[in-house]
Amino acid sequence: MAVKKFNPITPARRQMTMPTFEEITSQEPEKSLLVALKSKAGRNAQGKITVRHRGGGVKRKYRIIDFKRNKDEIPAKVATIEYDPNRSAYIALAIYSDGEKRYILAPAGLKVGDVIESGVNADIKPGNALPLKNIPVGTVIHNIELQRGKGGQLVRAAGGSAQLMAKEGDYATLRLPSGEMRYVRIECRATIGTLSNATNDIVNIGKAGRKRHMGWRPTVRGSVMNPNDHPHGGGEGKSPVGRPSPVTPWGKPALGYKTRKTKKYSDKFIIKDRRAK
C-alpha cells in the first residue's frame, strides 16, 4: 500500500500524508453487520473520565467483526475489501457458500474473489484460520486467541504479524510484534498472514483538525494547570515541578515506574520480556 503526499499549498499540507486506499473496493458497508456506536467521550458507566483527551469526532458505526473464525469447513468468497473507521487494519466481507455474511480482518494480499476457510483441514494461505497445532512452525500469523473459542485478541492492528516459533506439549511458542516471546495453548486459533495497511505507522496526520475528526482532543501540560488539577500546576509564571521527579496527574512517578502488576497470572506464559535485548 502506498502513501500519498501533498503539494505544500498550506503549512498543514506540507507535512501531511494519507493512505492511497488502493486496496479498498467498496465505499458502502454491509448494513446487516452494522450497529450504532454511541460516543463515550472517554467516560465509563459512572460518567468518570477513564481515557483523557477524547471527545467530539465524526459519528461512526461499528462493524461486527468475526474474531472467532469458527464457521468450519464452509468456504467463503471475499466480496469486498473495506475501510473500517474503528481500527487501523482493513476488513474484508466474506460471503459463505450457505449465504451467511461476515466481516474478517483483511490480511495483506487478500483480494476480491479469493476463497477462505476455517478449520483443521484449511490450507496454509493468507486469510485461513486454524488451530495452532495445525499450523507449521515458522508461519506468520495474526488474530491469535488467548483462550480457546474466545476469539482473537493478539495481533489485530495494521501491518501486524506474529511468528509461530515452536510447538511443545500443550503449548505453542509465539514471537509477538513487540519482541515478546510467550506460550499460547496449542488448541487456540490464529489466522494465516500479515495484516493489511502496513504503512499506517508512517502516515503523518499533518494538522490538529484531522485528530479532532478522529475524536482526539488536545493534551494540556500539567505545568500550565491549576494545582487542584495537576501536581505540577500552580505557581507564579513558569514554575518548576516542585518535586524530586515528574509525576502523573494522579501523583504516581511519571518516569521509570512499572505500571504492570508485579505478580500477574500470565507472567508464567511469558518466556522473554519485550524489553529484553
Swiss-Prot record:
Cell membrane keyword on record: no
SMART domains: Ribosomal_L2 (SM01383), Ribosomal_L2_C (SM01382)
Stretches for region Disordered: 222-259
InterPro entries membership: NA-bd_OB-fold, Rib_uL2_dom2, Ribosomal_uL2, Ribosomal_uL2_bac/org-type, Ribosomal_uL2_C, Ribosomal_uL2_CS, Ribosomal_uL2_dom3, Ribosomal_uL2_RNA-bd_dom
GO molecular function, one term: structural constituent of ribosome
Gene Ontology cellular-component annotations: large ribosomal subunit
SUPFAM superfamilies: Nucleic acid-binding proteins, Translation proteins SH3-like domain
Highest taxon of the lineage: Bacteria
Keywords from the UniProt entry: Ribonucleoprotein, Ribosomal protein, RNA-binding, rRNA-binding
PANTHER family: LARGE RIBOSOMAL SUBUNIT PROTEIN UL2M (PTHR13691:SF5), RIBOSOMAL PROTEIN L2 (PTHR13691)
Family in the record: Belongs to the universal ribosomal protein uL2 family.
Quaternary assembly: Part of the 50S ribosomal subunit. Forms a bridge to the 30S subunit in the 70S ribosome.
Name of the protein in its database record: Large ribosomal subunit protein uL2
Source organism of this protein record: Clostridium beijerinckii (strain ATCC 51743 / NCIMB 8052) (Clostridium acetobutylicum)
